[in-house]
Each structure stands twice: as structure tokens, then as C-alpha cells.
Amino acid sequence: MKIIAVTLREENVPAAFPFEARHYITDDFLRLADRCGVLLLPILSHREPGRLAARCDGLIVTGSNTHIPPWYYGEGPEDQASPADEYCLDRDLILEFAGENKPVLGICAGLQAMNAAFGGTLVRDLPNHDFTDRETHPVTVEPDTFLAGLYGPGIHAFNSFHTQAAGRVAPGFAVTARSAD
């Protein structure tokens, strides 16, 4: 059975309940892992990311309900209010797994974290892009890409609730799909 490391995200807990902090992963990841016959290994610690990368078969960097701070991709000072540990852990894991030539899948903010970890930037705030009032929107899949192999090139409906996006694409990365905005 393959072992896939997966990042967890911290649930927003009121300051009045500091001992109630929780970390989570969405049910979709659990169902998919079950269907694929893989074991998910939840990661919370910065301890020995190199050993972790050597022992696991891949990494999933999940999305987050917080913005990736500008300092993470070299465009601003460190913001004390940002979840630094979360994004530093993402970067450490991404670089270690990539260094081991292990597959890394970034989903939502996880993909944005991958782009930034390898030298790309982000668009900090997408206006009018909190599409919680609809399930999908049109996205154009580029030809001759992995995504085109799954869905075919052209326009497809995908869900997207992002308020940030890749800006400058990291060296060695390629855009596989685009939204009109």
C-alpha cells in the first residue's frame, strides 16, 4: 500500500477556547484515498521533512482558508498575523519531496504554495472571486497537458472558490488551465 503524506489545516477556533484547537482534512480526500487504496499520513510537524519524504510515496498539499502571506513569495515583510508555521511547513515538505523526485499534488492553496516555493508569485486578492453562490465556472484547459489528457482540451466547468491565484509562474512550471478572469 502506498503511503501519501498530507498536510492538515488548522480550524479557526475562538481565542476564548485556545485548548480547543483542531486540525482537519476534508472528507473528499479521505474518500479518494480509500478508492485509490492509499494510506494518508497526516503531517503537522516540521520535524525531519527529509526522512518523511524518503519514507512516503508522495505528498498532497491541501488548500487553506487563509491567504498565503506576501513574505512567503518575497513580496512583503513578514506579517505576524499570518499562519507562518503552516506555510513554512508546506514549503519545507514541497522542497523535500521534490528533491526526492516524489510526486507532489497541490490542491487550491497547495498549488499556489508550490508555485511560490519554486520562485513564482501570487495575485494577492482576486476581486469578486468568492463564488460560493455557484458550484462551477468555465475554465479553459490547455492542449497537450496532463489535465487535457484527463478532460480533453477546451472549456470545462470546474469549481473554484479562490481569492488568490498564481501570478508569475515558477520556472519549470506550466499553466494547464486558465479562467477568463
Model feature map: region roles:
Residues 1-105, 118, 123, 127-155, ...:
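N-terminal beta1-alpha1 cap of cysteine-dependent amidohydrolase-like domains
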Residues 108:
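Conserved G/P- and acidic residue-centered "switch" motifs that form tight phosphate/ATP-binding loops
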